[in-house]
Amino acid sequence: GRQDLQQKILRTVGDAPARYQEDALRMYRACRFVGQLGFDYVQRQGAGPAFGQPQTPYYMPQSYSFPVSRSAGLSLERVRTELDKLLLGKWAGKGLMLMMATGLAAGRCRVREQGTYREIDVLPELEHLAGLPQNQRFHCYDVWEHTLAAVDNSPRQLAIRWALLLHDVAKGLPGIRRLNKEGQPSDHGHEAESAVMAEVILSRLRYPAPFVQRVVWLVSRHMRFAPMLVTGERTLLRWLRSEAAGGNFKDSHEMTAAFEQLVAVFLADMGATHAGKNTELMAEG
């Protein structure tokens, strides 16, 4: 144990599958501890092939599988608590990568309604993002690892981190993914569908309505700032007036707080791209 701590390794005591059979929440806690501590997860049994893009911060030279079906017996409240703690971790991207690599993102949990339990999905909508290519003129990561880098770039505020986790969730889907005239992948308009999906996901996970509304607003507008770096101040002012009149905010203080979060989302998103270092590329993308 002491040697593992010195080497920043996280592993279960004894047989990993047995520990997860005893308490399925340990699977989520493993991801959360990786996200909080930045340790590398290893287990003695069941090592699989590498996962992720080589030579990126999120690459896993070995992957592992969790007994994901066991998570179906966990309450939503316990799972959501672990997700929130993971997202607020200093190394959240690394913990999320473990969650994806082990199949846990596609897990299920249960909610109680009118005296009976039913199963619900956790985050299967994220699965298709792993390995999903992007236009390399603008992007240095695939969609999933871009998402992880954007999360890690951001302030540790829950609404901001959920917004960044879900900001590109619609990329690659039919009707969104196309090829441009150079034959490169393009996901024009993905922000609108990502916002729709974010509302479905967060409502399913039973986050409070004001929180859901804020995250959805951030996702739906995360592409708005980039063109304004070229079009200028007048366009920005027209947009601000439109948002003020749109009924999304109860007062100017709430609107100011929302725009501060949106700036953080924009900067974190752009910081995880090539375009973030090039204003012309940013406006074009």
Model features per residue range: what roles?
Residues 2, 132, 137-139, 151-152, ...:
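Histidine/acidic-rich helix-loop-helix segments that form or flank divalent-metal centers
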Residues 13, 17, 39-42, 91-95, ...:
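Residue-level signal for secondary-structure boundary elements
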Residues 182-184, 237-240, 284-285:
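Short, low-complexity, polar/charged sequence segments that are solvent-exposed and flexible
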Residues 125-133, 276-285:
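Conserved alpha/beta core segments of nucleic-acid transaction machinery
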Residues 1-157, 161-165, 169-189, 193-209:
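Glycine- and charge-enriched loop/helix tracts that form the active or gating conduit
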Residues 49-51, 55, 235, 249, ...:
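Polar low-complexity intrinsically disordered regions enriched in Ser/Thr and small residues
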Residues 101-104, 113-118, 168, 214-222, ...:
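A glycine-rich phosphate-binding loop feature that marks nucleotide/adenosyl-phosphate handling sites
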